[in-house]
Design a protein with these regions (language model features):
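Low-complexity, acidic/polar, glycine-enriched regions of mature
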Residues: 24-189
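Bacterial N-terminal signal peptides
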Residues: 9-20
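N-terminal targeting/secretion presequences
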Residues: 2-3, 21-25
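Bacterial N-terminal signal peptides that target proteins for export
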Residues: 1-11
Length: 189
């Protein structure tokens, strides 16, 4: 064979190999039972946690190509439970989640970063009370038949108008709220 033919053929083969690698096949997952989404903060120095009763998660992810990953979470704010009825009613009210007007929040991220091992970060956007702000989620990916995504983020509540009015005082309720999740996933068939 002539070297004139081999050079274009090798170039084409290299391009096909590069394109095949760039178009990685991320697996698609949806949330399975057993998933949790909780937050922790304090009021007058007393720490408390709350659990979001309903949230739905969709993930597209290939650990070999985290830059192609996507995450979509829809969080139902009605029914948030802290174990204290008065506090739960206050959180549902206009000064906090304002569930009458904003019944849900969303978090979306496109393109994850590897932090080494099974650790990743997702620079995403949280929309809460009609306000969208960047929020970084760091997470551990545990592969398997039902992989898990266990993550943590810090949300600045005042950036979203959560805890307005008399509740703006950060000596009573800190601005930073810790959010953690463990999402059990199942593959989309």
């Amino acid at each position: 064979m002539s070297s004139k033919f081999l050079s274009p053929a090798l170039t084409a083969a290299a391009l096909v190999a590069m394109f095949s690698t760039a178009v990685a096949k991320a697996a698609d997952y949806v949330q399975a039972p057993g998933s949790t989404l909780v937050f922790a903060t304090s009021y007058d120095g007393e720490t408390f946690t709350g659990k979001f009763g309903k949230f739905d998660t969709k993930v597209s992810f290939d650990p070999a190509h985290p830059e192609l990953g996507t995450l979509e979470v829809t969080i139902g704010l009605t029914g948030t439970n802290t174990g204290n009825g008065d506090r739960d009613s206050t959180l549902a009210g206009a000064d906090f989640f304002n569930v009458g007007k904003f019944a849900q929040a969303t978090y979306t991220a496109k393109g994850f970063k590897s932090l080494g091992g099974d650790r990743y970060s997702a620079d995403g956007t949280l929309t809460l009370r009609g306000v969208s702000r960047p929020v970084t989620l760091t997470f551990v990916w545990t592969p398997g038949a039902q992989p898990t995504l266990a993550g943590k983020a810090t949300v600045k509540r005042l950036d979203f108008g959560v805890g307005g009015g008399d509740w703006k005082d950060t000596s009573t309720i800190p601005d930073a709220v810790a959010v953690s999740t463990k999402v059990v996933l199942k593959p989309v068939n």
